[in-house]
Amino acid sequence: MKHKIRHIHFVGIGGSGMGGIAEVLINLGFQISGSDMHSNSTTRRLQCLGAVIHHTHAAENIQSADAVVISTAIHSDNPEVIAARERRIPVVPRAMMLAELLRLRRGIAIAGTHGKTTTTSLVASILAEAGQDPTFVIGGKLKTVDSHARLGKGEFIVVEADESDASFLYLQPVLTVVTNIDADHMSTYEHDFNRLKQTFVEFIEHLPFYGMAVLCVDDPHVREIISMITRPVTTYGIASEDAQICATNIRHDRCRMHFLAHIGVNGSPRTLEVTLNLPGKHNVLNALAAIAVGNELGVPDEAIVKALATFGGVDRRFQQYGEIPLPDQGSFALIDDYGHHPAEIAATMAAARNAFPGRRLVLAFQPHRYSRTRDLFEDFVRVLSGADVLLLTEVYPAGEEPIIAADSKSLARAIRVQGKIEPIYIEQIDELKATIHTIAQDGDVILIMGAGSIGKSAPDLAEPAMKLTLITG
């Protein structure tokens, strides 16, 4: 690629999926520019690495570009896309550029509706602990390197495989993981769940004949597709007796998990005593997937165990800000999480209750997309009703037009009818901080969830406490 393409421009470079690819390309020696309407930590980091960042979308931004990379969030009427097509500059989907990176290394692609970011991060951490120095591109910021991506010198590249627009079909890894298959982004699949499952089969079949698919058989839909797959398979699970890699003796220890991992493939059966520096049974499953990958690649057991015990976490994946003092006296625990699907919310709430037993759970949630709210309305009502206190902000549209009866007021009404809790509707996200300070009690656990603008709320709430720590420290 490099002998023909030297300058690559990213439209929407501040997005987590875009910024990681851009960073790897910078470190490979490419000239990178990009546009994004807003400055964020990703754009600032890329600028420090040498990227040219524009905070407008304009045709002149791509004047010297040899290729233009876009995500599905970028529409065809974007002035940079129009200019690129007029000048016959290749306009490349983000996943296609990611596929080019996979061609440079042995690719490991992590797919599934939930758990991709954490599992990708765990796999990268295990390989790093084993001295493999992997390249990785992750949807969240891995705290140990404070970045979404890193160019390593080793033979492996670990990436997230995005099913939301079926673009993971561009990828051709040598090893893949499928964590689960759930109803989300269904408009991509014409609201046909069988089509979604078949697309996952097609993705797995992109593996070479010597490749390996690591599949979670606790998920019924993943189990259903195994008979359709012709590539080698390793299975993992907690609840499935036939899983080749499984966990028993699972114990919660506040924000850590302890379990025995039983490995029944690649050599004589053996058991690892694992401490996972993450909370929740869903993260035990993510860890089992990472163990399966490490086992397949011949990573020593000691490196696997150490990587899981010392895992530094990912931004906005059960990110803890500690105890935040209340104005008068007392404090509340503050947790921030990117989860925005009912299954993710349920798993994160369960993890919070096990990590902080007996404490009141206050959930502040911002629904993401009107279409998702409509398609999963009853599931949202059921799951959100499980909080002790619910703060519900208006839907983050993510470019969508409003849909009748798929807004947060409608959700609040439906939850109220259940009679379990009285949701507090917050029309403007800017009002969330004041509302939390109004209702918070000593000992509360405040869990902030959502994939939209609510992501700024936890740092804002924690800022006074962080400043106080700096002053007194």
Swiss-Prot record:
Q: Name one GO cellular component term.
A: cytoplasm
One GO molecular function term? ATP binding
Classify the main location. cytoplasm
UniProt xrefs under Gene3D superfamilies: Mur ligase, C-terminal domain, Mur-like, catalytic domain, NAD(P)-binding Rossmann-like Domain
- The residue ranges crossing the membrane are none
Enzyme Commission no? 6.3.2.8
Spell out the subcellular localization from the entry. Cytoplasm
Q: Which residues bind ATP?
A: 112-118
Which PANTHER family does the UniProt entry name for this protein?
UDP-N-ACETYLMURAMATE--L-ALANINE LIGASE, UDP-N-ACETYLMURAMATE--L-ALANINE LIGASE-RELATED
Q: What is this protein called?
A: UDP-N-acetylmuramate--L-alanine ligase
What species was this sequence derived from? Nitrosomonas europaea (strain ATCC 19718 / CIP 103999 / KCTC 2705 / NBRC 14298)
